[in-house]
């Protein structure tokens, strides 16, 4: 029976959300946290985008060093040969790609304005997949953008063409959140059965159904006899009304009535890391976690009603489906109310040594070497426009050369 694999797209779909964004260091921490959590793959960036170059190379280097241990790092590009060539010119060690192209009649007509028809879409995709493998890619996913508004006949043709040239999986993109759990189940199952390859499910929340659709889509693919790869973002942050939330989707798999008995993850996930990554993403994006967010919202384990409070005190399972400890919650958050020394863009070496010492991190005794780390911290503060968290400071101290690459943005660098 097929399994469920998580491909988190926070560092692609999440960061392209209007009015939001992450620094390259913050994106790197997200990858590290996803790896710690046991997530299968991160769509970690745009290898053709010039300002992503240092970040992409640095994260691939972290994977090579074993800092990122098991998480696959996959780049997103358009399904055109020019993008494939540019991606591998800028990131020669890239091994995993997703190639995206519009498949619906609406988008083909609306975007290309008569310059392309559906057969051109298939031709562009197949040529791009072949080019990616020729450049050294190990896995290539093919994205059918606006799949939920594409006819099933065309989707099957598109998927079979992708399979014929060796694509690893077909991404079914409910780009506008148009599907519902009933329609996506039937479509996903049909694609799995008729195309005969793993299907990736990518859902948006425009109608409030990203989690339900992801769950139903996963069920459909597995019932159709294939592995399923489900896209998530941390805290559901994504374009317009967002994507399927990572933690909520995991809870739906693991905790909903009867689902996990038959439909299981293909990789071990450490749910106790959920609170850590959700809280960091909230701080990094500067978007507060909704008070009622499943698993990580402030009210998720809060009780005021007399009947509920009495019941949960007697036995938490009376009114809680799962324990807060399972998500890594429960620690007391300490907030300094007295004197505090901070590390910022204008910090000096004395104060910086004090800050790092409080985290049990010893800086080099050599003043010049210590100042090099301090300078990186200053630049990181400038880029983030807010104080760095402890893990960011520790990362910079531990990996100064990688940090330098993350912080180096050169608009006019040669390809």
Swiss-Prot record:
It catalyses: oxaloacetate + acetyl-CoA + H2O = citrate + CoA + H(+). Its EC number is 2.3.3.3. Keywords: Cobalt, Magnesium, Manganese, Transferase. InterPro entries: Aldolase_TIM (IPR013785), LeuA/HCS_post-cat (IPR054691), PYR_CT (IPR000891). Catalyzes the condensation of the acetyl group of acetyl coenzyme A (acetyl-CoA) with oxaloacetate to form citrate. Signal peptide: none annotated. This is Citrate (Re)-synthase. It comes from the Bacteria.
């Amino acid at each position: 029976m097929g399994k469920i694999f998580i491909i988190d797209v926070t560092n692609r779909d999440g960061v392209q959300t209007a009015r939001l964004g992450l620094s390259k260091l913050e994106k790197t921490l997200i990858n590290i946290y996803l790896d710690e959590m046991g997530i299968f793959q991160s769509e970690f960036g745009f290898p053709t985008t010039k300002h992503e170059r240092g970040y992409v190379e640095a994260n691939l280097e972290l994977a090579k060093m074993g800092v990122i241990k098991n998480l696959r790092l996959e780049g997103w590009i358009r399904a055109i040969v020019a993008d494939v060539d540019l991606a591998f010119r800028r990131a020669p060690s890239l091994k995993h790609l997703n190639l995206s192209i519009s498949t619906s009649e609406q988008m083909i007509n609306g975007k290309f304005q008569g310059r392309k028809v559906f057969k051109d879409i298939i031709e562009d995709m197949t040529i791009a997949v072949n080019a990616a493998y020729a450049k050294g890619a190990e896995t290539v996913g093919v994205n059918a953008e606006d799949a939920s508004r594409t006819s099933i006949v065309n989707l099957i043709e598109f998927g079979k063409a992708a399979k014929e040239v060796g694509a690893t999986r077909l991404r079914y993109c409910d780009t506008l959140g148009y599907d519902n759990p009933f329609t996506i189940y039937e479509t996903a199952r049909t694609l799995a059965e008729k195309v005969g390859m793993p299907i990736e499910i990518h859902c948006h929340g425009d109608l409030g159904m990203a989690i339900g659709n992801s769950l139903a889509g996963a069920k459909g693919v597995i019932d159709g006899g294939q592995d399923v790869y489900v896209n998530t973002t941390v805290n559901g942050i994504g374009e317009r009304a967002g994507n399927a939330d990572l933690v909520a989707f995991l809870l739906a798999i693991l905790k909903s009535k009867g689902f996990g008995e038959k439909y299981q993850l293909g990789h071990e996930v450490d749910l106790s890391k959920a609170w850590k990554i959700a809280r960091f993403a909230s701080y990094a994006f500067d978007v507060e976690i909704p008070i009622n967010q499943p698993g990580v919202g402030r009210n998720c384990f809060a009780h005021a009603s007399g009947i509920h409070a009495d019941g949960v005190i007697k036995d938490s399972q009376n009114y809680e489906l799962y324990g807060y400890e399972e998500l890594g919650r429960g620690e007391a958050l300490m907030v300094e109310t007295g004197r505090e020394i901070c590390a910022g863009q204008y910090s000096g070496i004395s104060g910086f040594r004090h800050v790092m010492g409080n985290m049990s991190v010893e800086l080099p005794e050599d003043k010049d070497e210590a100042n090099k780390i301090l300078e990186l911290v200053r630049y990181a503060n400038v880029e983030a426009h807010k104080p760095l968290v402890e893990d960011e400071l520790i990362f910079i101290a531990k990996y100064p050369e990688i940090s330098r690459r993350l912080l180096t943005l050169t608009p006019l660098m040669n390809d």
